[in-house]
């Protein structure tokens, strides 16, 4: 799937501004938003963030999902690879669709 085929609108410029301001070097989508079972009325958007080396977001991390929700218009479940369960981490990383990558 490509970003153009997603069932939600992604403003890549707003996403880029969000990521640059927070030291995120890669932001990807995973989960139901990439599959046919995504329900725009009920589903949240699963996001996987990779921070640049040395970036430590601290407690601000917990507000990033709400900030992204305002950009994408859906509730966001904000994650890093370390926060994902070891039982499905590898699968998530394999299926993730990047929507921002630091140049």
Give the ranges of each region predicted by the language model.
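Catalytic core of pol beta-like nucleotidyltransferases
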Residues: 1-28, 34-41, 51-103
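Short, aliphatic-rich beta-strand segments
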Residues: 46-49
């Amino acid at each position: 799937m490509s970003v153009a085929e997603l069932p939600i609108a992604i403003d890549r410029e707003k996403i880029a501004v969000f990521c640059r301001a927070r030291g995120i070097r890669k932001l990807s989508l995973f989960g139901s938003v990439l599959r046919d079972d995504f329900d725009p009325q009920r589903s949240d958007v699963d996001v996987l963030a990779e921070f640049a080396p040395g970036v430590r977001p601290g407690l601000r991390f917990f507000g990033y999902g709400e900030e992204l929700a305002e950009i994408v218009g859906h509730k966001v479940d904000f994650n890093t690879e370390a926060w994902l369960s070891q039982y499905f981490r590898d699968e998530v990383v394999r299926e993730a669709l990047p929507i921002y990558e630091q140049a």
